[in-house]
UniProtKB/Swiss-Prot annotation:
Pfam families: WD40. GO terms for biological process: iron-sulfur cluster assembly; protein maturation. Keywords: Repeat, WD repeat. This is Probable cytosolic iron-sulfur protein assembly protein Ciao1. Essential component of the cytosolic iron-sulfur (Fe/S) protein assembly machinery. Required for the maturation of extramitochondrial Fe/S proteins.
């Protein structure tokens, strides 16, 4: 029987913890929350300890932290409407421009682009212009409501965003004029889309929502053998699977493991659930099964989950209950 084994419970933040992010090497992670601080944790022997506290970068709650692909930089998105860039435990740049809370931040695969999104309904794309310099390359106003999450495609410079307007949007740079355009709108959820994550090759996307469902989307490129029409020769995204009935409240985060293909969800019912694609799953109509559920993973809402990028089967979670938990999937 497959189950999640709790390996560590970590405390240190004051108040709710909003975000956790594994370092690309998988041997440390960053956390952020209501206390306006970022903590960097690493494993010492068999104990996870806070190595550094970064507390001078933001004036309000920090909503999300993300490491650059090289692992040298950390970006933090805050309710103070700024995004901070950290290097060697120092705040080296502060990105200003959003009118309201910054909800999410994401680095492109190359590390040359950074995306941010906000309650002001906009998505900003920043170019890394040199040492600690960032230039705004685009301001995208495609959403009609608060934008909750931005995530870059794992291999291409394609950006996905999730919003309070119930949609997901895809953005890419135009080959004609170098402008960033909205290339697709993914509509199927009936309430806020809280989070999204690509699979390993970026051909599929998982989304989670306030409507208590997970949805799997597939990319259909021009000339695809499924016969899906692609107007203007742009990639079309279709919802190919809806997972409902397993969550009783809003699903706040989702993580698609790049090594195992397992999907983890973080829910407002205090639970964490792991889904596996069925062995007889079809490409254009995939099926997933609930592999295991930790119904009381935390004492309050689970805000974030993320699979370790190096250690297969290791999962981290954080919650309104002020704890971070590290889990191991045991088969």
């Amino acid at each position: 029987m497959v189950r999640l084994i709790l390996e560590h419970t970590l405390q240190g933040h004051k108040g709710r913890i909003w975000g956790v992010a594994w370092h690309p090497k998988g041997n440390s992670f960053a956390s952020c929350g209501e206390d306006k601080a970022i903590r960097i944790w690493s494993l010492s022997g068999n104990t996870w300890t806070t190595k550094t506290i970064l507390s001078d970068g933001h004036k309000r709650t920090i909503r999300e932290v993300r490491w650059s692909p090289c692992g040298e930089y950390l970006a933090s998105a805050s309710f103070d409407a700024t995004t901070a860039i950290w290097s060697k435990h120092e705040c080296t740049a502060t990105l200003e421009g959003h009118e309201n809370e910054v909800k999410s931040v994401s680095w492109s695969r190359s590390g040359g682009l950074l995306a941010t999104c906000s309650r002001d309904k906009s998505v900003w794309i920043w170019e890394v212009a040199g040492d600690d310099e960032f230039e705004c390359a685009a301001v995208l106003n495609a959403h009609s409501q608060d934008v909750k999450r931005v995530v870059w495609h794992p291999t291409k410079e394609v950006l996905a965003s999730a919003s309070y307007d119930n949609t997901i949007k895809m953005f890419a740079e135009s080959a004609l004029d170098s402008d960033w355009d909205c290339t697709a709108t993914l509509s199927s959820h009936t309430s806020t889309v809280w989070s999204i994550d690509f699979d390993a090759d970026g051909e599929r996307l998982v989304s989670c929502s306030d409507d208590a469902t997970l949805k799997i989307w597939r990319a259909y490129h021009p000339g695809n053998d499924a016969g899906i029409a692609t107007p203007d020769k742009t990639t079309v995204w279709k919802c190919v699977c809806t997972l409902s009935g397993e969550h009783s409240r809003a699903i706040y985060d989702v993580s698609w493991c790049k090594q195992t293909g397992l999907i983890a969800s973080a829910c407002g019912d205090d639970g964490i659930r792991i889904f596996k694609e069925c062995s007889d799953s079809k490409r254009d109509a995939p099926t997933f099964e609930l592999l295991t559920a930790e119904e009381s993973a935390h004492e309050q809402d689970v805000n974030a989950v993320e699979w370790n990028p190096v250690t297969a089967g290791q999962l981290i979670s954080c919650s309104d209950d002020g704890t971070i938990k590290i889990w191991k999937l045991q088969e």
